[in-house]
UniProtKB/Swiss-Prot annotation:
<dbReference type="InterPro" id="IPR002474">
    <property type="entry name" value="CarbamoylP_synth_ssu_N"/>
</dbReference>
<dbReference type="Pfam" id="PF00988">
    <property type="entry name" value="CPSase_sm_chain"/>
</dbReference>
<dbReference type="GO" id="GO:0006541">
    <property type="term" value="P:glutamine metabolic process"/>
</dbReference>
<feature type="active site">
    <location>
        <position position="379"/>
    </location>
</feature>
<feature type="active site">
    <location>
        <position position="381"/>
    </location>
</feature>
<dbReference type="GO" id="GO:0005737">
    <property type="term" value="C:cytoplasm"/>
</dbReference>
<dbReference type="Pfam" id="PF00117">
    <property type="entry name" value="GATase"/>
</dbReference>
<dbReference type="GO" id="GO:0005759">
    <property type="term" value="C:mitochondrial matrix"/>
</dbReference>
<keyword id="KW-0809">Transit peptide</keyword>
<keyword id="KW-0028">Amino-acid biosynthesis</keyword>
<feature type="domain" description="Glutamine amidotransferase type-1">
    <location>
        <begin position="219"/>
        <end position="406"/>
    </location>
</feature>
<dbReference type="GO" id="GO:0005951">
    <property type="term" value="C:carbamoyl-phosphate synthase complex"/>
</dbReference>
<dbReference type="InterPro" id="IPR036480">
    <property type="entry name" value="CarbP_synth_ssu_N_sf"/>
</dbReference>
<keyword id="KW-0067">ATP-binding</keyword>
<keyword id="KW-0496">Mitochondrion</keyword>
<feature type="active site" description="Nucleophile">
    <location>
        <position position="295"/>
    </location>
</feature>
<keyword id="KW-0547">Nucleotide-binding</keyword>
Length: 453
């Protein structure tokens, strides 16, 4: 009897076939992804615990500084943030990759829509569980496929709660991801400390480039220490034309051509950027131009003003950190990614704290008492993350436009907007950025394969 029942099932199967036929092919391709075979992988914290899991990225070993983020979403933006250059990023969210990885599509300004830079910047990825089957209308590949294509090793199936507990108690530590082999204690000397590397030099453009609104109303110079695409978008969408300069460009020598100066985010120890600090100090001595800095830009501005910076025990990396505006008493929920902070007690007398972190009381911003200069440690452009503080870009652009108007009153012939010829000559995106370690590994493997052939 049961045999007769099961033989009667084809009609139901044909109905399912018709349903499948009505589903878009791209979605079905997502659903039908084959579960890949995983190699063994090991995540080792130097002088600390060892965690065994499965590799789902590039088949290569890597070392760097292990840091963690508690952000629930936004892994494509986080992993392409130049501020993570040289770091192994541990995600506390239990499941990562469920909405895949989008394409490198660009918007009307030529800026990447879904990434913060063209390449995956983190040295390695650590997750508790990775979604091998993803679904999102913008997705074109899985997190594992993306990591493999970018040469970045990634490990899943490890106890990220234990890892984060260790990092919170001991502080950010050097670590390594080893794929396809057992951990060897004799390899400890191979641990790479990104804090000893001038990371900003790696991620900064090597030549100026220009991005502009369709009808720019002001012209802003951006100091590129590893600028995120959404910072550029936040400026351009408010009517600014922007020319982006290398981190060590003597901006004080050309500031009179601009209506404002912006200092970007970036990776590593701020004290490595001695050239930037010097040029900013000279800029504040010789010009009244409005200045805005974010993250590393905030720290560099503080150093230029005469303050000091300190390294945090494990940093602040999340989308939900409360920061108090000391001028209004308003609390903002902010997006953050930094391992250093400004020591507010060392601010000169003509500066005052602007924001303070309500979790650890660290400084989150500063403002000049008499000039249009301010900076924030958190990211008001927040992609991903809350937009509570995005109005700071409005405040900055307003000050830029006021400065432009005041300069026009004194210098009627002054035109801060670049000539069309200059705009045509300048590049439209970063120039000469040093490839990530992952991309270097891929290039080396390709060279070796070609030589063997």
């Amino acid at each position: 009897m049961f045999a007769r029942v099961f033989k009667a099932m084809p009609a139901r199967a044909s109905a399912l076939t018709s349903v499948n036929a009505s589903i878009p092919a791209r979605f079905m391709a997502t659903v039908r992804q084959q579960r890949p075979a995983h190699e063994r992988a090991t995540f080792t914290i130097r002088d600390g615990p060892i965690f065994h899991g499965k590799s789902f990225g590039a088949r290569t070993n890597i070392s760097g500084e292990a840091v963690f983020t508690t952000s629930l979403v936004g892994y494509p933006e986080s992993l392409t943030d130049p501020s993570y250059r040289g770091q192994i990023l541990v995600f506390t969210q239990p499941l990562i990759g469920n909405y895949g990885v989008p394409s490198a599509e660009r918007d009307e300004h030529g800026l990447l829509k879904y990434f913060e830079s063209p390449n995956l910047q983190a040295a390695g990825v650590v997750v508790a569980d990775v979604a091998e089957q993803y679904s999102h209308w913008t997705a074109v590949e899985s997190l594992g496929e993306w990591c493999a294509r970018e040469g970045v090793p990634a490990i899943s199936g490890v106890d990220t709660r234990a890892i984060v507990t260790y990092l919170r108690e001991r502080g950010s530590s050097l670590a390594r991801i080893t794929v396809g082999e057992e951990y060897d204690a004799d390899q400890d000397e191979a641990f790479t400390d990104p804090e000893q590397i001038h990371l900003v030099r790696q991620v900064s453009t090597k030549a100026p480039f220009h991005v502009s609104a369709a009808d720019p109303q002001c012209h802003v110079a951006v100091i590129d220490c590893g600028v995120k695409e959404n910072i550029l978008r936040s400026l351009v969408s408010r009517g600014a034309g922007i020319t982006v300069f290398p981190f060590d460009y003597p901006i004080h020598k050309v500031a009179h051509h601009f209506d404002g100066v912006f200092i970007s985010n970036g990776p590593g120890d701020p004290t490595h950027c001695q050239e930037t600090t010097y040029h900013l100090r000279r800029l504040m001595e010789t010009s009244q131009v409005p200045i805005f800095g974010i993250c590393l830009g905030h720290q560099l501005l503080a150093l230029a003003a005469g303050a000091r910076t300190i390294k945090l025990k494990y940093g602040n990396r999340a989308h939900n950190i409360p920061a108090l505006d000391l001028s209004t008493g308003r609390c903002h929920i902010t997006s953050q990614n930094h391992g250093y902070a400004v020591d507010a007690s060392t601010l000169p007398s003509d500066w005052k704290p602007y924001f303070v972190n309500l979790n650890d009381s660290s400084n989150e911003g500063m403002i000049h008492k008499s000039r249009p200069i301010f900076s924030t440690q958190f990211h008001p452009e927040a992609k991903g993350g809350p937009l509570d503080s995005s109005y700071l870009f409005d405040i900055y652009i307003d000050s830029v436009k006021k400065y432009k108007a005041s300069q026009a009153a004194f210098y009627p012939q002054r035109d801060s907007l670049p000539s069309p010829l200059l705009v045509d000559l300048l590049a439209k995106e970063r120039v000469g950025v040093q490839p990530t370690i992952g991309m270097q590994n891929i290039a080396a493997a390709a060279t070796a394969a070609a030589a063997a052939a």
